[in-house]
From Swiss-Prot:
It is a peripheral membrane protein. The gene is MDM12. Signal peptide: none annotated. InterPro entries: Mdm12, MMM1_dom, SMP_LBD. Its main location: mitochondrion. Residues 62-113, 180-279, 356-376 are annotated as: Disordered. Belongs to the MDM12 family. One of its GO terms (cellular component) is endoplasmic reticulum membrane. It is found in: Mitochondrion outer membrane; Endoplasmic reticulum membrane. The lineage of its organism: Eukaryota, Fungi, Dikarya, Ascomycota, Pezizomycotina. This is Mitochondrial distribution and morphology protein 12. One of its GO terms (molecular function) is lipid binding.
Amino acid sequence: MSIDIDWERATSGPDGELLAERIRSFIHDKFQQIVLPRFIRSVQVTSFNFGTIPPELEIRDLSDPFPDFFEDDDENFSDSSEERSPTREPVDRYGNRVDSWQANSPGGPGGQMYGRVGFNQPLRMPEWEEHTGISPLRGPMNFGDINPYLFPRSGTPGIPGGTSNLGYYMPLSGLSNSQTPLGAVARGNPFSGGWPDAHGARPSRRRSEAEPDSAQSRPSTANTGNTLPSRDSMSVSDPHHCHASQGMSNNQGQVLEPNIPPTSPNHPLDDTPPRRMREQKAEDFQVFCRTKYAGNISLSLTAEILLDYPMPSFVGLPLKLNITGLTFDAVAVIAYIRRRIHFCFLSPDDADTLMGPETAAGSGGGDTLEPNSPRRKHSSLLREIRVESEIGRKENGKQALKNVGKLEKFVLEQVRRIFEEEFVYPSFWTFLI
């Protein structure tokens, strides 16, 4: 079933301009956190425009929402409070009042829909994990007053602009490297008898910082739930620990067994609390929607190319890059769970697992890829990005022209990386309505 979108009405007017400015500011902030190559300086995102061509949407399937969408990490916005006092002033997780914002949006009942846009609070880390040096590579999308439930911006040493989880969720079910994030979901109903136990005591998985010298490397995930606490992290007041130490010192030839019960893989030695899951209700549902886009969305960036002749960083040439359009084809997931809408895209592997392999369509021509082909599995959801570059003082010669190509390649890689890390499952966005 196809869906028609009034693209002009949705992206124009004061609300559309405000949303475009928020997206521009978000992309700009992400570029400020990237380690730039030596020959590039001062990347600025100057404008963003939705264009005039709408995407093509086709509903492919309906199902129960993913288990991750039921995780309740918002202490001040519970389901019971939503039903009893829907007009309560929004507060953050520390109890501080935040400004609310309401706007009229088209498409709702009667042509108007009153809603608020926001994001979940960041996941809590256990105390021993806060000292491991692992920091999430997340940056807040600064929606300002448009999002009363925005992540609080937290300053992190060593990362400009601070970091935030930004409604970002890693696969927290302990999957192996050979499985896709949705492999377990495809094998059966996520709400089978064993699902709460599997998610109740599973270790947390977090994303670590990427290598600073590799612009296109993706952060890796590491299972920190089963990691034993270090020797220094044990408190000297622990009776079991003191008993074991005294026994070893008083009997050098004999090692006494400490009075610590044996641990099992199901009970790791950490203080990570189990996830609080919302109860599934009959009205909760999830839509799989095929999304195709080949429009004229535009994004403008400015930067400086440094020339190394006659000395390193001798002069900087201003450069303007214009992304004039892109081609996009993916499966979107939209879940509705009691005044919350969760949104994300599926990777090609996950889309094939849930939706089944698709044959190449004749209308796609040579750009349509078989889902099981190696090229499809390792390609980006952004099939094509069209770029136009303008450089000042072209009389500087080959040195400038050579680095223009490098800069274009660098910018396109970063745009793809930002999109995949922020919008592809297991990352997802939550909107409060």
